[in-house]
C-alpha cells in the first residue's frame, strides 16, 4: 500500500470513527435529526439510527487497521468500497435535504 493510500485510509477511518462513535452514543439524536430533515420515510428512522453507527465503526476499524498495515489488502479494499458507498448515500441524502429547504 502506498503512503498516500495508507494516509487516506487512516484519515477516512478517523472520520468514520468519530461519526460512528457519536451515532452509537446517541441514536435518539440521530433518529430525531432524520425525522427533522424529512427525507426518508418515518418507519426507516429508528432502524437507520441504530445501524448507522455500528456500520461506521466497522468500516473505521477496518480502514484504520488496513492503513496501519495490520489488515490484508482485500478486506481493506472492501472497507474502502463500503466507505465510498456510505459517502455516496450521505451525499444523496444531503442533496435531498437541501432540495426540501
Predicted regions and their residues:
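Membrane-interfacial helix-loop segments of redox and metal-homeostasis proteins
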Residues: 1-101
Amino acid at each position: 500500500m502506498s503512503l498516500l493510500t495508507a494516509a487516506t485510509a487512516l484519515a477516512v477511518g478517523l472520520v468514520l470513527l468519530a461519526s460512528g462513535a457519536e451515532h452509537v452514543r446517541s441514536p435518539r439524536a440521530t433518529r430525531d435529526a432524520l425525522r427533522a430533515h424529512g427525507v426518508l420515510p418515518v418507519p426507516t428512522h429508528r432502524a437507520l439510527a441504530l445501524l448507522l453507527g455500528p456500520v461506521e465503526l466497522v468500516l473505521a476499524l477496518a480502514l484504520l487497521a488496513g492503513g496501519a498495515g495490520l489488515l490484508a489488502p482485500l478486506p481493506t479494499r472492501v472497507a474502502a468500497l463500503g466507505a465510498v458507498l456510505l459517502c455516496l448515500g450521505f451525499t444523496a441524502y444531503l442533496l435531498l435535504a437541501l432540495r426540501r429547504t
